[in-house]
């Protein structure tokens, strides 16, 4: 195993904070573009469906906040602080989520996901000590540090952790079927 280096979250790729189109305009909603919010299921690795969707009109209001597939999204406010998912297609998030469009030449997407899960747990723990609603803004989020090995080691670690996640998902499905 090689040396692990400290890397700021902002160095992992482009950081994008989500935006919400005007909710008073109903034509902004109900289209085919996923609109991820912390109330969506962020307990899974990949977000495949969102409760809300945007139309092309809604997208035009927040066009500079569109995320490509394989972006790592981190909820950065309130009781949902620290939840993490990866997008599976172009997605918009609301302003409660900071996302990383990972620099794939230097970092493995799945490794970044797992690193953000660890950071998310730390953020959530810290938030429990505050009486105010905890918020992690884009600049604070970008300045947090994580440890990263070489890209090759990141890929190896991600393969092992992903296999474990798949096994856990299979076991949950089996348990759900047995309980039914």
PLM-predicted stretches and their roles:
Residues 2, 77, 91-98, 129-158:
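A short glycine-rich beta-alpha junction/loop motif
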Residues 5, 32-34:
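A generic secondary-structure signal marking the coil-to-beta-strand transition
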Residues 6-26, 39-69:
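Sequence-specific dsDNA recognition surfaces
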Residues 1-20, 143-158, 162-180:
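Non-catalytic DNA-recognition/assembly elements of restriction-modification systems
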Residues 22-30, 127-129:
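Short coil/turn segments at secondary-structure boundaries
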Residues 110-140:
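Short, positively charged
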Residues 47, 54, 84-86, 123, ...:
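Short clusters of hydrophobic/aromatic residues that line enzyme substrate/ligand-binding pockets
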Residues 37-39, 51-119:
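A short beta-sheet element
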């Amino acid at each position: 195993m090689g040396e692990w280096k400290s890397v700021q979250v902002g160095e992992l790729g482009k950081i994008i904070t989500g935006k919400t189109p005007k909710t008073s305009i109903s034509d902004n909603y109900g289209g085919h573009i996923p609109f991820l919010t912390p109330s969506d299921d962020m307990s899974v690795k990949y977000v495949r469906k969102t409760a809300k969707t945007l139309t092309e009109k809604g997208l035009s209001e927040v066009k500079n906040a569109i995320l490509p597939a394989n972006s790592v999204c981190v909820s950065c406010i309130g009781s949902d602080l620290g939840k993490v998912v990866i997008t599976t297609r172009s997605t918009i998030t609301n302003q409660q989520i900071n996302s990383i469009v990972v620099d794939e030449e230097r970092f493995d997407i799945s490794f970044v996901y797992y690193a953000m899960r660890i950071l998310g747990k730390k953020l959530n723990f810290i938030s429990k000590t505050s009486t105010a609603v905890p918020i992690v803004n884009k600049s604070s989020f970008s300045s947090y540090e994580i440890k990263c090995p070489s890209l090759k080691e990141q890929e190896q670690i991600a393969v092992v952790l992903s296999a474990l996640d798949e096994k856990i998902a299979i076991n949950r499905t089996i348990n759900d079927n047995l309980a039914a």
